[in-house]
Each structure stands twice: as C-alpha cells, then as structure tokens.
C-alpha cells in the first residue's frame, strides 16, 4: 500500500521510499550532496557491465524516479522476472519499476496538504585529534616507531601547550590565541546542522464528465556543508474528460525548477581525514593557513577547499502527455498517447577569491586574489524527448474462460545538446558575468540523438481464475546498434496455478498459494548512442 508507506516513512525522494520494502530491489544512495541524483537501484543484482539501473515507467512513459514528487504517486510496482519485463524489450533487462500518479477522487472537491520540517546533521562524527600538541606528539611517536627522526620540535609542542591554557588571550600578532594557535576539530568546523523543509499541497475534484488534480510542492535543503543548498519547486496537473460514453481525452503535465549551489564536496571524507588542527578555518574575512612552519606543506584549509568554487546550477524540467481512449464495438478499446519532455540546465561556476592568512604571524601566507587568473565557465544543456504509443485491447469471457489480447506500436526519439564556454581574467570582482571577463579560453559543444521503434503484443488466458497463462512478444529496433543488429525479438511465456482456489484447500489455513513458471528473453540497449561507430585514436595500443 503506497499511501501507507509514504505516510509511515519521512523520505524526501521516491527512491528513498523504496529502500528495503521490496524483495530483490536494492536501493543505495551514492552521494550525500543535496540535490544529487546519486542513487543506485538494482533488481536481483547487477545484470550487465554497462548501466544496470532498472527501467522506470511513469504513467506509461519512460521517466526518472526522483523527478516525481512522492506525494503525487498513487502506486508503485516492481517487475523482476523476464516474463514480466519482456514486453519492454531491449530496455527491460535490468527490471522495471512502474509508477502511477494520482487522479481525482470521484464525487467531491478535495484539498490535501503534506508538510515536513526536519532537523538534519551528520549521523556520526568521526573521532579526530583536535588538540594540536597531542597531534604533534603522536606524529613524533609514529616516526620514532619506524626509526625516523621527530617530525615536530619540542619547542613547538611546548608553545601550543602554553597557548591552550589561555585561549582568549591575545597573541603578539593581535589575534586571539585560539585563532593564532588553533586546536581545530575539523568535523565540527565543516559540518553545520540545518533545517530541511518540504511542503506539498494538492487540489482535486470531479464532475459528471471531468476529473482534475493539481499539485505544487516546495523543498528547501540547506545541507550540512556550507554552499550546498538546493531548492526545488515541483508542479503537476492531471486532467481527463469523458467527452461521450465512448470517448475519453486527457492530459498530464508535471515538472520542476531546481536551484543548486555548487559546493565541491566530492571526496570530503578523505579531505577531512587529512585535516590538521593547526589551521583555523575562517576568521575576520580570511581563511586560515598552517600556523606551524614545521607542518607538512601538503596540509590545506578544508573549509576553503569546499568553498573554492562559487556558482549555481538552475534546471527546468517539463513532461507533458496527451491521450485519448476510445471504446469500440466488440469489447475493443483503442488508446493513443503522445509524450514530450524537455530539460534545460544552466550551470555557472568560477573560483572564489580570498587570502590564506597566518594569524600568528599577521601576514598573508597565500593569496587567491589574482583577478587575471580567475575564470568563469558557463555550461548549458538541453534534452528533448518525444514518445508515441498506440494500442488496441480486447477482452472476452466465455463461461469460465477469460481471454484478453493487446497489440501496440511505439516510437521514441531523444536529442541531447550541450554548450560550454570559459573566459579568463576578471576586470573586477563585482560582476560575475561573461561581459566582465576578458579572454575566451575555451568553447565547446556537442549534439547526440537516439531513436527507437517497437511493435508488441500480449495474450492472457484464465480458466476459473485457477489456471493462468500469458504470452508476450515485442519486436524492438534501436539506433544504438549497427544496422545489421538493430532489430531484436523478445518473447516471453508464463503459466500459473492458483492452488488455493482448488476445492481440497478451501476452508483451510491457506489463503493464497500460487505456483508460477515463466520464461523470457530480454535485451539491453543501455550503451552509448554511437558506440558501434567506435574509431581508432592516437595514443593507444592495439593488439594488431
């Protein structure tokens, strides 16, 4: 029951809701950065050396699981075996996740609000040495254990021992002792608890012929590291109308706008493990530097590293579907739908300015203020995709025999475009735009596309709701493969026996017992758009 699941788990993403709730479905977060789509999903293990992620279908069309607001979902199904996935042909090798979004409830106008406010901080802080005198003594002991000379002099150890007695005293440089002779816990210096919030409101209703649902949500996640905030506004509009008794038309529109700060927090745990206590993170508008000249020159200010780039990534996404359902004679139903989605992203990034300062010596140790070396990069990407589906369905009942059949056609096209430019040499540090940068140093762009077409069909049979059979067949073509290997046939068969429906089990403690046998053939098109056109390149060795 998805509604019960979503209310019982305070997950912020749809993928997070699925963690640990379906046998054989493995969900893990590969990045802790706010706004990151870093999620790994595997159904029954890794199925390929290429992309092993399952296919996600949202209201009948391929989508991205975390593009859907969890509050807009009505149900989620996970298809795992080959017989169930074969109807998706060369996209179903790694399993399929089916998502159906909410529609209006009949008979009344309804407004629903869902909100969440959460306090967030790292679940666990690593124990680090924050007392610098202790750090120096341990480093000396480590060197002695391998027969090497001391790393730090006793004079420096004694100096830090003396200054830590009066942390609020003033050093000769004029700065407080706790700044000039610091003892920094880098876990506490980097991570800052914050408040996460998400609010969703929806309105739905219906008349005799029209059903509608509208929703909007807002999410603000400041993260636990500075300069990593992400905000996101999502929207959805579902509409259907029974024009006549035999004709239904409708549309589904959803999308979002997100704004993500670009903190460089990749490898943050590795950097924190190398942090030394003798660098004060930030004071009086300056980043600290190593206050002990005996300290390794490879030591860095971790706070500056995480803030060394400034910028944002603004993304707009929209997904629109129009559909028509027609009831024809002889229990035949015709369905046609067209889906178009687009995604635009604009990323602007440049290094930050600032001095690395020695507070004990009252001098600039290293300067990051050279405007001539400061660069600005713009990266813009656009993805457009359309998909068309049409099906004919028939179902009939003859005594205890239930038979249904479906045949369909699908066409798909995707186009990716990207453009990037870099200019170097800021005229001033006020305007962070291309007009304020002097020299163009890099311009690049690319465009790729991908097309697919398919015909497919399904026949199901049931006798007395006890003996079941299903046959699927799909014929797929994909531009990602060479011309002679472009098309593939993907059949499947399954048979089932509801043993609990037999007379000899009725009235017993067995409520539901089913035996199922299935076989299927699947394909995988999760490769590059032009991998079959690979060419030779210089600088590589070939075995011929």
Tell me the role of every PLM-derived stretch:
Residues 224-227, 479-485:
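Solvent-exposed loop/turn segments connecting transmembrane beta-strands
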Residues 73, 235-237, 336, 453-459, ...:
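Extended, hydrophobic alpha-helical segments in both membrane/secreted and soluble proteins
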Residues 1-236, 243, 248-250, 256, ...:
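Short, small/polar-rich motifs associated with maturation and membrane association
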Residues 41, 97, 201, 237, ...:
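Membrane-embedded beta-strands of outer-membrane beta-barrel proteins
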Residues 216-222, 469-478, 519:
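Transmembrane beta-strand segments that form the barrel wall of outer-membrane beta-barrel proteins
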Residues 106-182, 193, 223-230, 234-319, ...:
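Surface-exposed loop/interface segments of Gram-negative outer-membrane beta-barrel transport/assembly proteins
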